[in-house]
C-alpha cells in the first residue's frame, strides 16, 4: 500500500511540474506573449 501511495504522489508531482513548465513556456512564447509588457521599453532614457 505504501508503495502505491508513493507512486501516486510522485506521479502527481511530476505531472504538475511538467504542466506548470508547459504553461509557463506557452505564456512566455505563445500567443499570450504579445500581451506581456516590457518595462525596459516603457522607460527608455
Curated annotation (Swiss-Prot):
Subcellular location: Plastid, Chloroplast thylakoid membrane
GO process terms (BP): photosynthesis
Superkingdom of this protein's organism: Eukaryota
Membrane topology qualifier: Single-pass membrane protein
Principal location listed in the UniProt entry: plastid
Pfam family, one: PsbN
UniProt keyword list: Chloroplast, Membrane, Plastid, Thylakoid, Transmembrane, Transmembrane helix
GO CC annotation: chloroplast thylakoid membrane
Membrane-crossing segments per the record: 12-30
Transmembrane in keyword set: yes
Function: May play a role in photosystem I and II biogenesis.
HAMAP family xrefs: PSII_PsbN
Similarity remark: Belongs to the PsbN family.
Name the record gives this protein: Protein PsbN
Amino acid at each position: 500500500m505504501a508503495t502505491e501511495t508513493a507512486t501516486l504522489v510522485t506521479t502527481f508531482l511530476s505531472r504538475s511540474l511538467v504542466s506548470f513548465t508547459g504553461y509557463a513556456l506557452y505564456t512566455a512564447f505563445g500567443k499570450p506573449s504579445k500581451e506581456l509588457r516590457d518595462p525596459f521599453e516603457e522607460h527608455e532614457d
